[in-house]
């Protein structure tokens, strides 16, 4: 009987230890649903070996905003004292405590330190282990899954556990709950109903104009067509310095749209004779991208960007960040990750908000059997001081954590002194028609306003659009763009985020708008209450745009023909070019770039031309009205170059 007593005691001890273990471990991730494309097969073989990657929690995420404000706020003693790329990477690398805590846990579970490597960017611990070991490590069961459409295989679990004491140090585990194949193209590209992926702005033109109209164009008829002369007159832009700084090239992003040198030369010959024929951007081609193309294949976006920017910045150079091979550029749901990978090598494997590296179910995967056969390009290009992006999506198009990880990267670029500007969109308070599962591009069955992405990220500068109304001159105030003209219908994008709260640098301006010009619509507070009580917008969300510039009736050569175009994609390279010009003047007097410009502009709105006429309709409403000060149609207003230059020359 005594042996049985000992056995009973031993079993009781095991049960007690098991209960204690369960009490001190927690579910770290759980898959809530599995796509019908994935078929669960047999449990993995216990002796199979796998590469295990544990994404470590990054340091300084909570203080990241304060770090950026410290170098971006004009009142800060550290204004414009930017970090190097290595300093930023080190600042956000996992802490020594995080690495040690996770490594100690692995050792306790039989994964000795000699088996574990830390990646170069310090963000991952990587080791080889058998199925039996990782099931024991994560207190779970792994199964093989087969994708019935693609034939791809993956191993995954439905949930996994980590010790409660270690959980705060772990962001993500692979293999884990995600069913992403290790390589290959997604079986189904998630598309908008009316657009194949990213919105290339504009999507309306160009509208043909008779050739004889070209000869009669001058600053007196800018209400009919906007030429470089009109832009200089509107924003009081003088000629550029004859000897620009060699390290101050303007960056322009393009994807799936390509310029033609013939179009640029035609534009220079007609409107900018001081720019030599053959002038072209510096190539920074990412993951198999190529440019230029024959004039018969020229894209309206790329031609527009360069034809607007060159007359402002020349003889400064322009760098073209042409992104992704032709196959992926026209067949991807994700946005911007491969571009950011190329600027920051650590971003390729960077973990934040439960996202580690690119998402192969959304982003391009390289090598690409149908295109670029090289490896994903990581950290191969240095970011320019200013980057202009005339592309965008809507917040509801991609997962929130995908967007938040990306937004953090824009913050990091700001810490390095990079100014990133985005077009605010061309659909007023809505998304493109068909987006958001509604014909009008709105949320909740076509009623709730649809904020844009990445515009809602508080660490970029959003540019809305204005126009010179018929009969007005360049010396009179512009108005918010609204063209209700059928196929060419267009309104300056603006609204409030469902992901990000109002940033501190913007809080006073937004509060003033609500106090003095309260929109006549019901609202909700917080994305979790989307549409509640008939609310049309999030009263607590980050507002956009931040600024504006002309974006209508823009003169352009495209496909060898002269016409007009427009969109906030025209406004953005204009504003970005002006910032690049200002940086050139700062460099000439021994100062540096200006980095994230929003805090300076919100504290000094008088350097912009306030826009007080117009609205940005959408979702069956008039949208938001312009107003004195900031508004969600034209932001703080359009540039006044002399005032902006003086402001930034006076700053450190």
UniProtKB/Swiss-Prot annotation:
Phenotypic consequence of residue 569 to T: 20000-fold decrease in catalytic efficiency
Active site (UniProt): 301 (charge relay system), 305 (charge relay system), 569 (charge relay system)
PANTHER family linked: PROTEASE S8 TRIPEPTIDYL PEPTIDASE I CLN2 (PTHR14218), SERINE PROTEASE AORO, PUTATIVE (AFU_ORTHOLOGUE AFUA_6G10250)-RELATED (PTHR14218:SF19)
Glycosylated residues (UniProt): 112, 218, 247, 331, 445, 613
Regulation: Inhibited by antipain and leupeptin.
Organism: Aspergillus oryzae (strain ATCC 42149 / RIB 40)
Molecular function GO labels: metal ion binding; serine-type endopeptidase activity; tripeptidyl-peptidase activity
Propeptide feature ranges: 23-215
Subcellular location: Secreted, Extracellular space
Modification(s) after translation: N-glycosylated.
Lineage: Eukaryota, Fungi, Dikarya, Ascomycota, Pezizomycotina
Cofactor(s) essential for the protein: Ca(2+)
One term under GO cellular component: extracellular region
Recorded effect of pH on activity: Optimum pH is 4.0. Inactive below pH 3.0 and above pH 6.5. The half-life (t1/2) values for activity loss at 30 degrees Celsius are 150 minutes at pH 6.6, 5.5 minutes at pH 6.8 and 14 minutes at pH 2.4.
Pfam families (UniProt xref): Pro-kuma_activ
Effect of residue 426 to N: 8000-fold decrease in catalytic efficiency
Predominant subcellular localization, coarse grouping: secreted
Listed name of the protein: Aorsin
Keywords: Calcium, Glycoprotein, Hydrolase, Metal-binding, Protease, Secreted, Serine protease, Signal, Zymogen
Enzyme Commission number(s) from the entry: 3.4.21.-
Gene that encodes it: aorO
GO BP field: proteolysis
Impact when changing residue 301 to D: 1000-fold decrease in catalytic efficiency
């Amino acid at each position: 009987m005594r042996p049985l007593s000992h056995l009973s005691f031993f079993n009781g001890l095991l049960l007690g230890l098991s209960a204690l273990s369960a009490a001190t471990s927690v579910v770290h991730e759980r898959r809530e649903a599995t796509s019908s494309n994935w078929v669960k097969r047999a449990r993995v073989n216990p002796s199979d070996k796998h590469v295990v990657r544990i994404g470590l929690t990054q340091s300084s995420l909570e203080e990241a905003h304060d770090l950026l404000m410290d170098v971006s706020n004009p009142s800060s003693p550290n204004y414009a004292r930017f970090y190097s790329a290595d300093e930023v990477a080190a600042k956000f690398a996992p802490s020594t405590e995080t690495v040690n805590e996770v490594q100690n846990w692995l050792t306790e579970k039989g994964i000795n330190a000699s088996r574990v490597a830390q990646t170069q960017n310090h963000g991952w611990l990587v080791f080889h282990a058998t199925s039996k070991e990782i099931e024991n490590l994560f207190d779970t069961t792994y199964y093989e899954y087969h994708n019935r459409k693609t034939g791809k295989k993956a191993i995954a679990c439905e949930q996994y556990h980590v010790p409660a004491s270690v959980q705060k140090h772990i962001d993500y585990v692979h293999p884990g709950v995600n069913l992403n194949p290790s390589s290959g193209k997604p079986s189904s590209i998630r598309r908008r109903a009316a657009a194949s992926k990213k919105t290339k702005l504009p999507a309306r033109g160009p509208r043909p104009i008779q050739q004889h109209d070209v000869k009669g164009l001058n600053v007196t008829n800018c209400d009919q067509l906007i030429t470089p002369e009109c832009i200089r007159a509107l924003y009081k832009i003088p000629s550029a310095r004859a000897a620009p700084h060699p390290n101050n090239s303007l960056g322009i992003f393009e994807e799936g749209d390509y310029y033609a040198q013939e179009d640029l030369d035609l534009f220079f010959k007609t409107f900018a004779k001081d720019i030599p024929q053959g002038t072209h951007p510096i190539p920074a081609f990412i993951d198999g991208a190529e440019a230029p193309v024959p004039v018969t294949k020229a894209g309206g976006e790329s031609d527009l960007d360069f034809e607007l920017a060159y007359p402002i910045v020349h003889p400064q150079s322009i760098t073209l960040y042409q992104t992704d091979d032709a196959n992926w550029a026209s067949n991807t749901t994700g946005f911007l990750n491969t571009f950011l990978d190329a600027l920051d090598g650590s971003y390729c494997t960077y973990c934040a908000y439960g996202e580690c590296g690119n998402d192969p179910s959304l982003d391009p995967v390289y090598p690409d059997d149908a295109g670029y056969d090289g490896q994903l390009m990581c950290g191969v290009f240095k970011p320019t001081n200013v980057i202009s992006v005339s592309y965008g999506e809507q917040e509801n198009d991609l997962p929130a954590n995908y967007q938040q990880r990306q937004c953090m990267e824009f913050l990091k670029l700001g810490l390095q002194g990079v100014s990133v500007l985005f077009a605010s969109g061309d659909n007023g308070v809505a998304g493109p028609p068909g987006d958001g599962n509604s014909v009008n591009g709105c949320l909740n069955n076509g009623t709730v306003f649809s904020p844009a992405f990445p515009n809602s990220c508080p660490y970029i500068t959003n540019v809305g659009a204005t126009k010179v109304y018929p009969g007005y001159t360049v010396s009179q105030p512009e108005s918010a763009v609204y063209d209700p003209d059928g196929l060419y219908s267009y309104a300056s994008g603006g609204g409030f985020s469902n992901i990000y709260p109002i940033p501190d640098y913007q809080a006073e301006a937004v509060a003033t708008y609500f106090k003095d010009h309260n929109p006549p619509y019901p609202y909700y507070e917080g994305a979790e209450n989307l549409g509640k009580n008939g609310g049309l917008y999030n009263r607590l969300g980050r507002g956009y745009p931040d600024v504006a510039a002309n974006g209508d009736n823009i003169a352009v050569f495209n496909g060898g023909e002269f016409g007009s175009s427009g969109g906030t994609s025209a406004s953005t390279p204009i504003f970005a070019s002006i910032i690049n010009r200002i940086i050139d003047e700062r460099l000439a007097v021994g100062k540096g770039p200006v980095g994230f410009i929003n805090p300076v502009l919100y504290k000094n709105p008088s350097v912009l031309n306030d826009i007080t006429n117009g609205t940005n309709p959408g979702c069956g409403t008039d949208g938001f009205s312009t107003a004195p000060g900031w508004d969600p149609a034209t932001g703080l207003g359009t540039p006044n170059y002399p005032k902006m230059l003086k402001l930034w020359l006076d700053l450190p």
